[in-house]
Each structure stands twice: as C-alpha cells, then as structure tokens.
C-alpha cells in the first residue's frame, strides 16, 4: 500500500469489537478544526445576513419571517426515533439542497411565497452554522461536521 503524506487511514475493527461502534467513532471525529472551522462559520454568518437582506429587499413580511425561522428545528423530533434517524431527518432539514431547490422554483415560477420560504430556510441554516451547529453524525446530536457541541464539546480540543 502506498502511504500519502498527511493521509489518515481507518483500520478494520479487531476481532471481538463492534464494527458499528467503530464506524460511529470514526464518523464522529470527522469534524473540521481551526481556521477552516472559522471560515465555515463565517460563511454561515454571510448566508444568514445575505438571505435576510434579500428577504428584506424582496419585501417579505417580518411576521412570516419570525414565524417560520425556527421551523427547520422541528426536525429535532427525529431524535425520538434514535440518533441515526434523527441525524438523517435533521440533516435533510439543515442541508442547502432543499431550500436551494425551493429558491430556484420560487424564481422560476415567480412565486413570492415559495421564494420567501426558501430565503427564511437558508437564513436559518446560516445562523445555525455561524453558531457552530453543523450537520449531524449518527453518533449523536452533539457530533457535527463543525465540531462537538453541548456536553460533548468538553472533550474537544
């Protein structure tokens, strides 16, 4: 096997260990650190500010903005079915893919409501990322692509 400088290799679990636990542990450590983490959080802040500004320019209702801003966090309920299902549902609600598709549809269909929902949704994702709440790993809610959060954060350097 050729070894690449700086490459990390995940070894197979040893006999007598739980492969699922080892996989979850490997996933949970895959978060960014240092300057890259700061850059991703600043990108989140820029997304929040940009989408909120676009919403204001678009002339959306601030009551609607306030009412819908936390709707993506209803995806927390997925954790009632366990960490794996919770992570899948949370990540579906906090990925850029669905709101960007909705935004494109809003422009294409000239639908102010659709566009407003997309802008609010993206603003929500942006502020979450700015605050360090990244996409979740199946190891548990506290394990994100931006690092550990909550009580799990104390074990992160």
Task: List each language-model region with its residue ranges.
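N-terminal membrane-targeting hydrophobic helices
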Residues: 2-157
